[in-house]
């Protein structure tokens, strides 16, 4: 496939709208599909098995159209009212009556959720049982990728693969140099990547909601209020922090609005897009370079997550999406290939130690940190200041550095991930 077409195809697959945090959404989507396979039969039991990472990210995050958090209500709503054709927006259209029925399902203890002992990062298995039959739906590898479907013992789809520590795409883009991907994107026209601007508009709306209303722990709104008081400067860095955090404040509290996700994560989408919006507000950019910058950001996020995993013990918003935003801003400011490589090294050298301890309202603080580091790393590189190679995990090239980060994520953070989950489960009394 021609390089530009592969880039466009990848962007269209990886940059899609999502309603709610994508881990509980994946559970709801699996439940919705399993219920559709079961038809009108009355459910006697719903057995849900998820990977440790899905469990971790779904434990404390708000669910749209409810005032609740967690996988149980997400799964129950998927059974009661989810429509699988809505994909990652499966929870859109939920009404109060649906929530009441979902509560009845949970009260009757018909829904169970357990952790499946798998090293697969993204895995959701839903088994529904009725007096007259049963159904199974399994999602693996991506939040919306069904790999197994069965209806009363009849297998309808079987694409299950043996779990690996990270389900890596065979996309040849991720073996290329990032500078070559950027060069190709810089030649694309609006007719080819103009759709990138849809995500900018979508994520700006949710950021504005986070600024207008008290949601989550109000990280973005607090920055805004202190800018208004003159305590903080109304500059690029604070605007990037404010907008990015505000989007997460709203989203993690379960706001009934979609976000444009990136590589399977809504918060990654916010982090990949909103610092660029902040730059655009301070230093207006024409539509074409703006769309190109967004494409660079999303492609870089996908590139890094190819190596660290779509879910991991590292905060993908910080080290992947934040790096995408950072090099996009550097590119808009005229950075050449060497300075873009330097920006990547600065970001990874800064935020490689940021852990993921699940999706929750506190993520807004991490997104603010990532947005701030994105501006700082770009400005440092533009001024010729880059972390030297062999300082820690920083390699000779940007790609070497990303691969080193991947080794850290897959090998070094394996036990850290289990320890994080152990601590979280202990606090939940599980």
From Swiss-Prot:
GO biological process terms on file: L-cysteine catabolic process to pyruvate
GO MF term (any one): L-cysteine desulfhydrase activity
Signal peptide (from-to): none
Taxonomy, superkingdom: Bacteria
UniProt cross-references to Pfam families, sorted A to Z: SDH_alpha
HAMAP family in the cross-refs: UPF0597
Annotated family: Belongs to the UPF0597 family.
Protein name: UPF0597 protein Clos_2050
Species this chain originates from: Alkaliphilus oremlandii (strain OhILAs) (Clostridium oremlandii (strain OhILAs))
């Amino acid at each position: 496939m021609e390089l530009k077409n592969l880039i466009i195809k990848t962007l269209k697959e990886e940059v899609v709208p999502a309603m709610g945090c994508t881990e509980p959404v994946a559970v709801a989507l699996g439940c919705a599909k399993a219920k559709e396979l079961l038809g009108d039969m009355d459910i006697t039991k719903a057995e849900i098995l998820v990977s440790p990472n899905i469990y971790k990210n779904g434990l404390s995050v708000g669910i749209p159209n409810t005032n609740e958090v967690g996988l149980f209500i997400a799964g129950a709503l998927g059974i009661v009212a989810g429509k699988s054709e809505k994909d990652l927006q499966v929870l859109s259209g939920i009404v109060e009556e649906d929530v009441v029925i979902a509560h009845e399902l949970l009260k009757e203890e018909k829904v169970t959720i357990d952790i499946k002992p798998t090293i697969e990062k993204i895995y959701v298995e839903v088994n529904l049982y009725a007096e007259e039959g049963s159904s199974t739906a399994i999602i693996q590898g991506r939040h919306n990728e069904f790999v197994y479907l069965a209806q009363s013992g009849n297998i309808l789809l079987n694409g299950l693969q043996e779990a690996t520590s990270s389900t890596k795409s065979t996309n040849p883009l991720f073996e290329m140099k990032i500078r070559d991907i950027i060069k190709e994107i810089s030649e694309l026209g609006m007719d080819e990547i103009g759709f990138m601007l849809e995500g900018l508009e979508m994520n700006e709306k949710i950021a504005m909601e986070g600024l207008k209303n008290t949601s989550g722990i109000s990280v973005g709104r607090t920055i805004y209020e202190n800018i208004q008081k003159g305590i903080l400067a109304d500059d690029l860095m604070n605007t990037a922090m404010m907008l990015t955090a505000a989007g997460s404040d709203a989203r993690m509290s379960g706001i009934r609005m979609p976000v444009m996700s990136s590589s399977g994560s809504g918060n990654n989408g916010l982090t990949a897009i909103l610092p660029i919006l902040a730059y655009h507000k301070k230093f207006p950019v024409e539509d074409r370079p703006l769309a190109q910058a967004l494409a660079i950001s999303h492609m870089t996020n996908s590139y890094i997550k190819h190596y660290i995993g779509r879910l991991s013990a590292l905060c993908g918003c910080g080290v992947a999406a934040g790096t995408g935003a950072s090099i996009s801003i550097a590119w808009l400011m005229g950075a050449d290939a060497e300075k873009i490589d330097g920006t990547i090294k600065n970001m990874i050298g800064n935020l490689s130690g940021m852990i993921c301890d699940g999706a929750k309202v506190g993520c807004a603080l991490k997104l603010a940190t990532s947005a701030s580091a994105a501006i700082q790393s770009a400005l440092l590189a533009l001024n010729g200041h880059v972390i030297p190679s062999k300082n820690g995990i920083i390699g000779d090239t940007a790609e070497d550095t990303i691969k080193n980060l991947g080794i850290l994520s897959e090998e070094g953070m394996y036990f850290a991930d289990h320890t994080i989950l152990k601590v979280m489960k202990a606090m939940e009394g599980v």
